C-alpha cells in the first residue's frame, strides 16, 4: 500500500545517504523494512534481494549466503570475456548464484525457499534500475519504484 511505498522510499534514501552508494529499500509482508546497497560485487537490486531473503528466512544479515569464490569468477566473466564495464551482479545473476550455492549450502537453500514470500512487497531504489533488474523484480511480484536519476558513473547498467 501507500504506507509501505513511503517506508521503502524513506529506507532507500537513508541507506544511500549512509552508504554514499545507490541503495534500495523493501517492506516485507510482516512490515519489516530491509535495505541493500551497491557494493564491489553486487548492484543495489541484487543486494536488496539477498538481504530480503535473509530476513525472511531468519538468517543472520552478516552471513555471506554466496561465497566470494562463486561471485568473483562471475564478475570476471562479465568484464573479461563478455566485455561489460559493470562487474557487479544483477538480481537475476545473483539468484542463479544463490541456486548453485543452495546445492551444497542448506542456509542458501533456506534463503532460496523464501522467494515466493516476496510477492506483493514494495521496493524502492535511489537510482533507475536496469531493465534486467526491473523485469526480475516484477516477475517475482515485487512492486518497484525508483528515483528519476541515473547512477553517475553508469556502473549500474548493461
Give the predicted meaning of each segment.
Residues 1-23:
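Short, basic/aromatic recognition patches
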Residues 1-8, 42, 46, 105-109:
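Electropositive phosphate-/nucleotide-binding environments in soluble metabolic enzymes
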Residues 63, 71-158:
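C-terminal binding/interaction regions
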Amino acid at each position: 500500500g501507500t504506507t509501505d511505498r513511503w517506508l521503502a522510499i524513506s529506507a532507500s534514501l537513508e541507506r544511500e545517504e549512509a552508504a554514499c552508494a545507490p541503495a534500495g529499500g523493501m517492506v516485507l509482508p510482516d512490515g519489516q523494512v530491509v535495505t541493500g546497497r551497491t557494493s564491489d560485487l553486487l548492484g543495489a537490486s541484487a543486494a536488496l534481494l539477498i538481504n530480503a531473503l535473509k530476513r525472511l528466512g531468519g538468517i543472520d544479515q552478516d552471513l555471506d549466503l554466496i561465497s566470494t569464490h562463486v561471485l568473483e569468477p562471475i564478475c570476471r566473466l562479465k568484464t573479461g570475456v563478455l566485455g561489460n564495464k559493470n562487474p557487479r551482479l544483477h538480481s537475476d545473476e545473483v539468484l542463479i548464484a544463490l541456486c548453485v550455492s543452495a546445492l551444497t549450502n542448506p542456509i542458501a537453500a533456506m534463503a532460496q525457499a523464501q522467494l515466493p514470500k516476496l510477492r506483493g512487497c514494495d521496493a524502492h531504489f535511489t537510482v533507475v534500475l536496469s531493465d534486467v533488474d526491473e523485469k526480475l523484480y516484477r516477475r517475482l511480484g515485487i512492486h518497484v519504484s525508483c528515483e528519476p536519476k541515473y547512477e553517475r558513473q553508469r556502473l549500474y547498467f548493461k
